[in-house]
């Protein structure tokens, strides 16, 4: 589960390009919070702080307690705009969390893919899904979905129905889908092909 990040923000009442530039010159980043049937709230964040957290893994699935004018709101990052050259955060969209569950796009970590059985036999580990969309309990939002693939053999597919998700999470789609495959490289032999050729050579 993601640890809850504590951030402070300030309300803003001036809008438009000029106001945004003035904020950035002052070392702050314009942002907005919306969703859950609430009136959108325009805020600003300290630039160095939000850029530091954005550069950490899985920021987009990070649960945040955002303090605005001494009031706390539970939010999630929705979209981040970056400077095209410096990668400094220029604007952030957040969503309010009021429901018990939240739809989330979460990174997938394929643990042991370099040493998977099929890869050791000359196969290629092909990633089909780098992120998956989950329905999660707001108090149990994972940073990622980690899947151990060390025992995955050649010419097989890793399907969603075989994945054990973190507690309180489920796939949004009920339809089965493929996350990864191990396919043979050109010139690579499967174990069965190798045995067959050895048997023929011994005749």
Curated annotation (Swiss-Prot):
It holds the Pfam family Ribosomal_L25p. Keywords: Ribonucleoprotein, Ribosomal protein, RNA-binding, rRNA-binding. One of its GO terms (biological process) is translation. The keyword Amino-acid biosynthesis does not apply. GO terms for molecular function: 5S rRNA binding; structural constituent of ribosome. Gene3D superfamilies: Ribosomal protein L25, beta domain (2.170.120.20), Ribosomal Protein L25, Chain P (2.40.240.10). GO terms for cellular component: cytosolic large ribosomal subunit. The keyword rRNA-binding applies. It comes from the Bacteria. This is one of the proteins that binds to the 5S RNA in the ribosome where it forms part of the central protuberance. HAMAP family: Ribosomal_bL25, Ribosomal_bL25_CTC. Belongs to the bacterial ribosomal protein bL25 family. CTC subfamily. Part of the 50S ribosomal subunit; part of the 5S rRNA/L5/L18/L25 subcomplex. Contacts the 5S rRNA. Binds to the 5S rRNA independently of L5 and L18. This is Large ribosomal subunit protein bL25. The lineage of its organism: Bacteria, Pseudomonadati, Pseudomonadota, Alphaproteobacteria, Rickettsiales.
